Amino acid sequence: MIISIAAIVVTLSILVTFYTSSPRSEFLPEPKGSSLEFIATRLEVPWSIDVDSKGRIFFTERVGRVNMIDASGKVLNLFSKDVAKVGEAGMLGLALDPEFESNGYIYIYYTYSSNEGLFNRVSRVKIDNGLIREDILIDRIPAAEIHNGGRIKFGPDGRLYVATGDANNPMLAQDLSSLAGKILRLNKDGSIPDDNPFPNSYVYSYGHRNVQGLAWNPINKMLYATEHGPIANDELNIIKPGANYGWPYERCSEAKVYEQSLLCYAVSIAPSGATFATDGKYKGILFFATLRGEHVEMVTLDVSDPTKVVKMENFLSGLGRVRDVLYHDGYLYIATSNRDGRGIPSIEDDRIVRVRLG
């Protein structure tokens, strides 16, 4: 059941953290000028959020649904797919075409089951007069019950970036012939860009365990990615074309043989969706969701040197597991993940909430 409810103002938290995360807590004092609204409740593991120029909110639910919340707050199911509902698999990433208002294209990443096992794919979907047309762009991405990646985002260059997991087979991350454990880059029609770092390959970077968040700094257009580590060693990385991020040979590039992480967390927080504020007083600040950490992390970078972190703060606590965050037009949109089998859901979970950044 999906319901939309009226805005409820609750509190936020601003609390400094250092490579650790606090346990689930009650809401803390609200920063001046900020408020939080419940946009939709009783969802089934919302996984990815996007917002169009009209303010309509699009999101996936892992059970196989793609939904929209219109400007009046009404939740509509646009379409559903028969996805593999095992472990962390299912309907995962979603991205609207940069020209969505004119072409209506929605890009999705989901897991399916075949006679040969589990696979992930990236498709482009258009709804036209009630008919759903799906064009498969990339297929047979290795999948498993865990480590499916799944985040898809359009970069400032107009290319679609796809985060894949190692499909619980760590060595695939180092295999350039495999699509697993990578960040992929493709044109909107599914073709390979001529300027990709490896000839005739979707691979943009490799050596990844399970990337869950992608975000571009609006100041310098650099790509940042969040990644789950083993036990601990969760990472925030700056992604460079053709770079090797070391998995499974290194954790957080301990020996500095591979590309070094910007942040390495000694305690597991399970970082997920990421976003930069693109305007206002928060411009250039990175926000990312944490599942095990159960908060939204806020990272302030050095303006003159974006490879240096100035400050990390716990921006929002009290919602439980957080799967995705998205900044749009002065608001931070947040999806919880308390019904994913690892949380403690309340009757109103899962939720999509919206925070106005004051």
PLM feature spans:
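Beta-propeller domain segments
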Residues: 24-29, 89-91, 99-101, 167-313, ...
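Surface loop/turn motifs at the tips and blade-to-blade linkers of beta-strand repeat domains
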Residues: 38-44, 79-86, 137-144, 202-207, ...
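Beta-strand-rich domains and repeat architectures in extracellular enzymes and scaffolds
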Residues: 38-64, 270-275
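Conserved beta-strand position repeated across blades of beta-propeller domains
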Residues: 47-50, 95, 153, 215, ...
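Generic structural signal for coil-to-beta-strand starts
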Residues: 56, 65, 105, 159-161, ...
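Beta-propeller domains
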Residues: 58-79
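Blade-loop segments of beta-propeller domains
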Residues: 74-98
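Asp-box/WD-like beta-propeller blade repeats and closely related beta-sheet repeat scaffolds
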Residues: 119-153
